[in-house]
């Protein structure tokens, strides 16, 4: 399996090189040149680690399959408390794929607990011995998951940049208290798009690469622009489907819809890849909050980032520049020239419009919708009161949208974070007066619902804060060169 840039068909690399580089030299993203076909009958009874090995081996063909099996077994064992790919029935025809039972209580753990192993092995595969410096822009959950995955690894340094005042207090403390001599964390005076734009600018700056090369350092990314972030996320779509069949909730071969709360389009794109591999996926439903640039795009074919940026109670989706959409555009248009043109238009004017054929292909696989904070809060309350099911603010957005687009097909909502990462907003949605402290809110939410508080979150206020530096977006370049 080879990988090419979305913007230049002549940029071809191995999977190891794609994972190590993160971003293509031309600014494009690496995509597979083909999709391996799933062996559904053979895979349906596999454990989560066994299934992960099969999916990974189809794409990462320059990795030893035995290594991939060992890496998956080491990743998806005790750290996920036996709940990797856990599917919970909410009510008839509606299910929640709970992806927050990992060490940092967010779906990012599925990729970022495994990806460090893939990166270290990629360096071995390619005979690379330099230090790898990983730059991460985060809207909240990616930062902590990446820090937890890469902390303490020899030959690896990681720098995380998050929007100051753009995360929950729990998310901020998860990053600011991270242990490890090879980690650095910076708050950025701006929003996620500001951080992501300047991180991508650093990757494209030849002078940065030249200076770091003198010091035997190369840059890489742990954001979902890196193929190594996407491929592990394909696994849980297959696993969820197999569990629904096993439980008697879905007939074998029956299409299932998946509703995904997304901002950067990576999680839902993994579902598209699963569909291309042969999983019976009906519609992939893109759920947005008030920052509904993706909703508008899927409906109209015009991507227009020239709009007000809103801070919402679902901050991990507060994004206007959705990086992974570029991969989908390449797959449905089949034209790197078109993609390069659209991305140039976006950089220059803040918008682009795709052709009618490309839009029709997108709409054939994707539906969409959006929900604001008020609707999300009402959904949290409704799901708890009607179904005794507690969800976080991001998952609530997906439940809202799922209700508006549901067909007769079973619907799986991807639950992307623990409700205890946003305890004040969840508690308020349940009609309670939320304390000022997130930790007091955690305790009150536990009393209200009886749902256990994840241990990794409950101890955060006892850990020393190591990082409290706030920088301007333009200073990300200096941090990368430190």
Task: Tell what function each PLM region has.
Residues 1-482:
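PLP-dependent amino-acid enzyme catalytic core
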């Amino acid at each position: 399996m080879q990988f090419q840039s979305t913007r230049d068909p002549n940029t071809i690399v191995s999977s190891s090189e794609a994972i190590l580089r993160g971003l293509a030299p031309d600014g494009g993203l690496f995509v597979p040149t083909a999709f391996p076909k799933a062996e559904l009958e053979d895979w349906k009874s596999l454990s989560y680690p066994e299934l992960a090995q099969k999916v990974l081996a189809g794409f990462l063909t320059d990795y030893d399959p035995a290594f991939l099996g060992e890496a998956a077994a080491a990743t998806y064992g005790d750290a996920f408390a036996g709940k990797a790919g856990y599917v919970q029935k909410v009510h008839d025809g509606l299910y929640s794929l709970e992806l927050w039972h990992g060490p940092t209580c967010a779906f990012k753990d599925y990729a970022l607990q495994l990806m460090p192993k893939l990166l270290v092995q990629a360096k071995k595969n390619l005979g690379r011995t330099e230090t790898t410096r990983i730059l991460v822009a985060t809207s909240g959950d990616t930062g902590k998951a990446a820090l937890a995955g890469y902390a303490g690894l020899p030959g690896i340094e990681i720098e995380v940049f998050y929007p100051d005042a753009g995360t929950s207090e729990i998310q901020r403390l998860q990053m600011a208290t991270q242990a490890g001599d090879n980690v650095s964390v910076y708050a950025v005076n701006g929003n996620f798009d500001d951080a992501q734009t300047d991180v991508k600018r650093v990757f494209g700056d030849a002078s940065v690469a030249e200076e770091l090369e003198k010091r035997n350092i190369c840059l890489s990314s742990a954001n979902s622009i890196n193929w190594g972030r996407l491929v592990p996320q394909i696994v849980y779509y297959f696993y969820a489907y197999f569990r629904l069949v096993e439980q008697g909730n879905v007939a074998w071969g029956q299409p299932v819809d998946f509703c995904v709360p997304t901002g950067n389009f990576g999680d839902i794109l993994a579902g598209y890849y699963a569909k291309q591999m042969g999983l019976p996926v009906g519609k992939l439903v893109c759920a947005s909050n008030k920052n509904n640039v993706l909703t508008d795009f899927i409906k109209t074919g015009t991507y227009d980032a020239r709009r007000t940026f809103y801070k919402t109670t679902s901050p991990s989706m507060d994004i206007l520049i959705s990086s992974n959409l570029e991969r989908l555009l390449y797959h449905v248009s089949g034209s790197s020239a078109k993609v390069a043109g659209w991305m140039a238009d976006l950089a220059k004017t803040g918008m682009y419009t795709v052709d009618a054929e490309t839009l029709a292909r997108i709409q054939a696989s994707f539906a969409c919708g959006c929900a604001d904070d008020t609707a999300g809060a009402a959904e949290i309350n409704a799901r708890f009161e009607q179904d005794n099911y507690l969800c976080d603010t991001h998952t609530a957005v997906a439940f809202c949208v799922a209700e508006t687009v549901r067909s007769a097909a079973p619907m799986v909502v991807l639950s992307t974070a623990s409700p205890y990462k946003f305890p004040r907003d969840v508690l308020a949605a349940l009609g309670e007066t939320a304390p000022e402290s997130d930790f007091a809110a955690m305790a009150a939410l536990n009393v209200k619902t009886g749902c256990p508080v994840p241990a990794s979150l409950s101890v955060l206020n006892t850990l020393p804060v190591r990082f409290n530096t706030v920088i301007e977006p333009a200073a990300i370049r200096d941090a990368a060169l430190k």
